[in-house]
Each structure stands twice: as structure tokens, then as C-alpha cells.
Amino acid sequence: MATFSLGKHPHVELCDLLKLEGWSESGAQAKIAIAEGQVKVDGAVETRKRCKIVAGQTVSFAGHSVQVVA
């Protein structure tokens, strides 16, 4: 499983994480995928586009998974 470092930031918004990981070409595509229930956070479907993802959470989409670290 890949990891994503928050660096100095306390969180990253879910739609931004999809873009930063290269799983979505644009913010609009990321938001559509989230709204359609294609994204899971810690194993549960997440439909909030701007959901704040913090260290320790795992995000999955289209066969990819990433563990968020501080």
C-alpha cells in the first residue's frame, strides 16, 4: 500500500487527495467519483467531497489504496 505524507498540514480534503495521487485528472472528476460512492475511507463509502482526511486514515479508489501519514 502506498503512503501519502501530509507534511506540515493537519489534513487534506478528499477531492484534493484523489488529484494529488493522480487517481483523477481534475477536481471535477474527483468530485463526481466521490458523489457516486466510488471512494472509501477506512473501508466505508465516503460521499463528502471535502471530507478532511487526517493521518492514520486509508483511502481506496479504483483498485488503489493509500495510507495517510503525518
UniProtKB/Swiss-Prot annotation:
<keyword id="KW-0694">RNA-binding</keyword>
<protein>
    <recommendedName>
        <fullName>Putative RNA-binding protein YbcJ</fullName>
    </recommendedName>
</protein>
<dbReference type="GO" id="GO:0003723">
    <property type="term" value="F:RNA binding"/>
</dbReference>
<dbReference type="GO" id="GO:0005829">
    <property type="term" value="C:cytosol"/>
</dbReference>
<feature type="domain" description="S4 RNA-binding">
    <location>
        <begin position="12"/>
        <end position="68"/>
    </location>
</feature>
<dbReference type="InterPro" id="IPR036986">
    <property type="entry name" value="S4_RNA-bd_sf"/>
</dbReference>
<dbReference type="GO" id="GO:0006412">
    <property type="term" value="P:translation"/>
</dbReference>
<dbReference type="Pfam" id="PF13275">
    <property type="entry name" value="S4_2"/>
</dbReference>
<comment type="function">
    <text>Its structure and the presence of conserved basic residues indicates that it probably binds RNA.</text>
</comment>
<comment type="subunit">
    <text>In pull-down experiments interacts with CedA.</text>
</comment>
